[in-house]
Curated annotation (Swiss-Prot):
The gene is trxA. Belongs to the thioredoxin family. The keyword Transport applies. One of its GO terms (molecular function) is protein-disulfide reductase activity. InterPro entries: Thioredoxin, Thioredoxin-like_sf, Thioredoxin_CS, Thioredoxin_domain. Keywords: Disulfide bond, Electron transport, Redox-active center, Transport. Coiled coil: none annotated. GO terms for cellular component: cytoplasm. Component of the thioredoxin-thioredoxin reductase system. Participates in various redox reactions through the reversible oxidation of its active center dithiol to a disulfide and catalyzes dithiol-disulfide exchange reactions. The keyword Aminoacyl-tRNA synthetase does not apply. Disulfide bonds join C30-C33. Residues 1-105 form the Thioredoxin domain. This is Thioredoxin.
C-alpha cells in the first residue's frame, strides 16, 4: 500500500530518497483518483524495494502540487535522484504504468 506524503515531508521523502519515487497526486472528490488507488497500491507492492510509491492529497497539501504545476488529477510523477523525470496525467492502466516506470528508472 502506498504511503502518504505531505508538503512538510516532500523534500525528505521524495527529493532526498535513495530510491526512485512515484508520487500520485489525488483528491478525495476525484472519481478517477479513486479508481487509480488500487492500481497504485498493487504497483507499490510489486515494486517494493525498487521504487518508493507515495500519495499526496492536493487539498490537504496545496504547496507541492502548486510548485510542480499540477492542474489536473490524478497526476503521477516519477522522481529520481531528486529530480522530476516524467509525468502521467489521468487514469492509467497498471501494465502501462509498470512499463513507463521500468523505462524511466
Amino acid at each position: 500500500m502506498a504511503n502518504n506524503v505531505m508538503d512538510s515531508s516532500f523534500k525528505k521523502e521524495v527529493l532526498e530518497s535513495d530510491l526512485p519515487v512515484l508520487v500520485d497526486f489525488w483528491a478525495e472528490w476525484c472519481g478517477p483518483c479513486k479508481m487509480l488507488t488500487p492500481i497504485i497500491d498493487e504497483i507499490s507492492k510489486e515494486l517494493q524495494g525498487k521504487v518508493k510509491v507515495l500519495k499526496m492529497n492536493i487539498d490537504e497539501n496545496p504547496n507541492t502540487p502548486s510548485e510542480y504545476g499540477i492542474r489536473s488529477i490524478p497526476t503521477i510523477m516519477l522522481f529520481k535522484n531528486g529530480e522530476q523525470k516524467d509525468t502521467k496525467i489521468g487514469l492509467q492502466q497498471k501494465n502501462s504504468l509498470l512499463d513507463w516506470i521500468n523505462k524511466s528508472i
